[in-house]
Each structure stands twice: as C-alpha cells, then as structure tokens.
Design a protein with these regions (language model features):
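Single conserved hydrophobic/aromatic residue that forms the stacking wall/gate
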Residues: 1-7, 11
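Short gly/pro/ser/thr-enriched loop/turn and capping motifs at secondary-structure boundaries
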Residues: 56, 162-165, 226-228
C-alpha cells in the first residue's frame, strides 16, 4: 500500500505537475503484486537489479521512503544524492543495483552479479527484472546464454505489462510465451498470474528451490498490467478506457484487501488504521523530500570516471 500511495503522490500537481519532480517518471501502479510476491522467497543477501520503473523495487528492498522521494525531487538526501532521479536509484547497502534507463541493459549486468555470487561461492541469487519490451533485445539473449552456460544463480523475472511504451506485445513479439525464449538456452521457467500475490509468491518459492537444488538459472514471466501510462508524459491513447477499467477489476492491492477481509477475517477497522497510518507516513515523506536541500554544485564532478 505504501508503494501505491507513494506512486500516486508523484501524480499530484504539486509534485510532478508543479515541476517538483524533474525528468521522466515511470509509475508502478498495478504491478505491485510482482515485487511484493517475490519477497516471499527472497534472502536478505540476494541482489536485485531492474530497469527504470524502479520505485516499487527499491522500496521493497527496505530503503527509507524519504530517501526514495528525495531522489525523485532531486535532493541531497536522495538515495542517489539527487543525481539519479526517478530512473537511476541505487543502494549498495540494500543490495539494489538499479534503476537503469536503457531497455534491457540491466540484464547482462544482473548476470554479471550472478557470476560474482558463484565466483565467491556466495549462497545468493541475482534477481533480474526486465519488461516485455526488453525481450527482443540482443543483449538479453546473450545474457540468457551465459547464465545457462556458466550455470549461474540468476532468477529472471519478466514483468509483462502488455505494452513496451505504446506498442502492444502483439505488435512487437512473434511466437509463443515470452519466457519460452529462454528455453532454447536450457533455462527452465513458467508463466504466472502477476496480478495475484499468492500465485507470484508460490512461483518465487519454486524458483528459489530449483536454483538452489540445480545451480542453474530460472525464468518467470509475470502476466501483469500498468494502470498508468508508460511515463507521466504518456496519455495512453493506444489503449481503451474499457481495457484499463477491466484490468482494474483485478487490482492487486484491492484483491489483497478483499482476501484479508474474507479469507483471513481481518477487521475492516484494522485495515483502515493501516491505511490511515500509511497516509500519515507519506505526508511526512513528502514534507521531508521538499525540505531537503538541493545537492552541492560540486556533486556534478563526483562519481565521474574517465
């Protein structure tokens, strides 16, 4: 819920519309079940790398929301010192290696991290997230090949939200399921309902057991959906309101709320208290991010390598 609230805050006029958030901003609204469900199998020492829709991922790694929002607003206290913005968030302490703006570029890097885990004999898994739009990139196939060839502890997670920017998956990808493209390299995998937290959780546990038992990579295709446009500047004219509204009927956050109420008999008042507490936390996060100082000009020259 905190992830959803923080994403919605980006939409408000006083932040993105008022120019408080600069550059691009890719929201994760609708896809929360993927990153939260994966947590069921994650080891605190595992590493995570993803593309530019990274807000939900870094929050799930336990990074303070104040640091995340301060990065969005380009402040000194941001997790990347205000220099990364929405798309380039990193936290070595939380083993989160980005936040990458180039489609598919994070995949070979994630395989490299997996190689490091194996080389150092670490009992860790490199979790590599990528979108459906990256699944036709050559470097992704090269990464699949090396991960399989070297038997690396890598879990590839495809967040198939049906659109690569404004291009539907049906117009960009021929053949069968996306995860099956990795099978030619000997990588086993499956496709899962990525709008259902419990399905995601079960698949993540299966994946971890397979990787640990066989010392080989695994791939999961998460069938999910983004409720907002590709980025804040995208009006989403390539899909109908009916399509979006139909998908909102299986909103993972609302579905989880219904499950807690009906199956786990959690009281409505308890959920309201949680939501109220999160709203207060988010107000504090917003206040902190806007009061944080801007980076010093000398930061322009730090972390620059020639």
């Amino acid at each position: 819920v905190r992830s959803r609230r923080q994403r919605q805050m980006c939409i408000r006029d006083r932040l993105y519309g008022a120019g408080k958030i600069g550059g691009f901003c890719h929201l994760y609204i609708g896809q929360e079940a993927v990153v939260i469900g994966i947590l069921s199998s994650i080891n605190s020492e595992d590493t995570v790398i993803t593309a530019y829709r990274d807000h939900g991922h870094i929050l799930a790694r336990g990074v303070d929301p104040k640091l995340v929002m301060s990065e969005l607003t380009g402040r000194k206290d941001g997790i990347s010192k205000g220099k990364g913005g929405s798309m380039h968030m990193f936290s070595k302490a939380n083993r989160f290696y980005g936040g990458h703006g180039i489609v598919g570029a994070q995949v070979p890097l994630g395989v490299g991290i997996g190689f490091a885990h194996k080389y150092r004999n670490e009992k860790k898994i490199s979790r590599v997230y990528l979108g459906d739009g990256a699944m036709s990139n050559g470097q992704v196939f090269e990464a699949f090949n090396l991960a399989s060839l070297w038997e690396l502890p890598v879990l590839f997670i495809i967040e198939n939200n049906k659109y690569g920017m404004g291009t539907s998956i049906g117009r960009s990808a021929a053949g069968g399921e996306l995860y099956e493209r990795a099978t030619v390299f000997g990588i086993k995998g499956e496709k899962v309902d990525g709008m259902n937290f419990f399905n995601v959780s079960e698949s993540a546990i299966r994946a971890r057991e397979y990787i640990e038992k066989n010392s080989k990579p695994y791939i999961i295709e998460m069938d999910t959906y983004r409720f907002r446009g590709h980025s804040m500047s995208d009006p989403g004219l390539y899909r109908t309101k009916d399509e979006v509204n139909k998908m909102k009927e299986i909103d993972p956050v609302l579905m989880m709320k219904e499950t807690l109420l009906n199956d786990y008999k959690i009281q409505e008042d308890t959920i309201k208290d949680i939501e109220s507490d999160i709203k207060k936390q988010i107000k504090d996060v917003e206040k902190f991010s806007l009061e944080s100082p801007l980076p010093d000009l000398k930061e322009l020259y730090t972390e620059v390598y020639l």
